[in-house]
């Protein structure tokens, strides 16, 4: 199967058994995990997992558990959506059992449930923005993984805190380089973070996802060693640049290595 030809959307919605029962679904999550992992080994199919906030019996704690479980599957995208109470939906038609508040106009998005307060839904919306920028975009995968591991944060806590900081900072429409600087400064302030290792992760992320080969100012370091490294790479037949192919080169100070990327093709998955 040609890589990128097929995208699978997997509607997990929740991993909370009480929620799954309330929405009249049956799900063997162990089986879902097995299938997702098997497909991932082929490296040719884009997998998109969906979670829905606002479902019955799903509070912030249990949604966090669903988020962490879904995130651990490592799909290319983890979509954090919000329940829409369309006409005919049980939570709309049975207000005694599901006393929810939702917007009067389409798409009738949930605003409050017996299990989630409006301010908690705001927390999740901010987390969604951070998740889109860092994970679903594919731009900061190594950065997020390093920061979570070093600071000892679960994915849910990490993205909730990052989203809240982004909302305070006003990152909604800022350019990528500015968001990179914001993310670096925010992660650098977390406990357990080594700034050199954090920069290493961000450099690898930026070089892997930006075919200009250019690093933003916040990651740029003036160092004569870089010029020498570029020269040595060019002189070695095994690492010499290909004619007409753009290359990005950087020094990694945490691991004391040189990293380079030749932009010959894009991962279609």
Residue spans for each PLM region:
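Conserved non-cysteine loop/helix-boundary elements of the Radical SAM core domain that shape
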Residues: 1-105, 111-114
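Short flexible/disordered coil segments
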Residues: 6-18, 45-51, 74-77, 108-121, ...
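Short coil/turn linker and secondary-structure boundary residues
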Residues: 15, 27, 58, 116-119, ...
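Generic alpha-helical secondary structure signal
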Residues: 18, 30, 34, 61, ...
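A short, terminal or domain-edge coil/loop segment
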Residues: 33-43, 64-73, 101-110, 130-144, ...
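Contiguous mid-protein beta-loop-alpha structural module that forms a pocket-lining wall or clamp
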Residues: 70-77, 81-176
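Radical SAM enzyme core and accessory elements
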Residues: 129-269
